[in-house]
């Protein structure tokens, strides 16, 4: 090894932590600016569409909003939209509320790249997290009868959706009309939920089915354990 090797080796080693610190600083600054700008634009968009928004809203990325009904966001709601969240990053947070529809998202909820279409009522209760790329619908979008569908006649089935409080919906789930998901329930990633889920139950699959109840060590005091039935 030459003297020059000895001279330059420490310099190369010392540069690594410096570069890492610079990288971390840039990432932190980018996240901060992304969140500040995203939140400002989100509040502006929501105000234009007549939404009722609580304090402490935090948004990364740009929202898509269409509101002909009522849109209510509680305090401390956090949302990621687009590439702000790697999971489901090819999508954006999107709200579509038809005339007469009411979408309410409670305090402290978190959602990422979720598509919500509401024609009657969708309620996401406080402390509920909805993973990246989920879809929540309270409508079938079309008539069931093929002739009615082709002719555009008849009623489109709709039914309210209610989720939480403190529920967790894994990424890329689909929640269909008429579904109720109870307090503290967990829905496995990629599930299609078509029926009611009880409090502190774990469901997964397409269509989703009951897996088990949360064990006593996993759930608050007083909640039944894994041996409980549905």
Show which residues each predicted segment covers.
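Conserved catalytic-core motifs of eukaryotic protein kinase domains, centered on the activation segment
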Residues: 140, 147-148, 179, 213-215
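A short, glycine- and basic residue-enriched loop/turn
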Residues: 160-161, 178-179, 200
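Domain-scale signature associated with acetyltransferase and cell-envelope carbohydrate enzymes
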Residues: 1-137, 164-166, 183, 199, ...
